[in-house]
Amino acid sequence: VGIGDLFSLRIAGNIAGQKVLGSLEFACQAKGSKVILVLGHTDCGAVTSACQLRLQQKQISDVKEMPHIQYVLGPLMHSVESVYDIMQPRELNKTFVNQVTAMNVHYNIQYIINNSTVLKDLLDRGEIAIVGAIYDVKTGHVEFLDA
């Protein structure tokens, strides 16, 4: 992997799962990628939908028109609940959704570290870095998050 080369993974809701872990392990262990960037973005439809469900006191199973949406929204609910517990007012607005987006980036970094011994070992040895950021879809600005 050279300068400017990317091994890109995209998934609705920016959710790390088993397939994402496998792809990240391949990118780092087999292909030599040195940085994992967990990049959330503003105006994320999946994050907004998860927030909306919680604020309306609905369950994912209430979304009948998309029977597989549980695999996208389910992992987001941890971040939604974390923000819901600490934030006032609890309403569907830009501030609430942005806080959930940032929390979700942090949560997924921890998920990667806690669920992949390969990536954790590479991280502990200083062979890779895992960083989080939020991409603003309106301005193109990327804000890197504190660890």
PLM regions and their residue ranges:
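Short helix-loop-beta junction
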Residues: 1-8
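Divalent-metal-activated hydrolytic enzyme cores
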Residues: 4, 13-34, 45-147
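Conserved functional hotspot residues or short segments at active or partner-binding sites
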Residues: 38
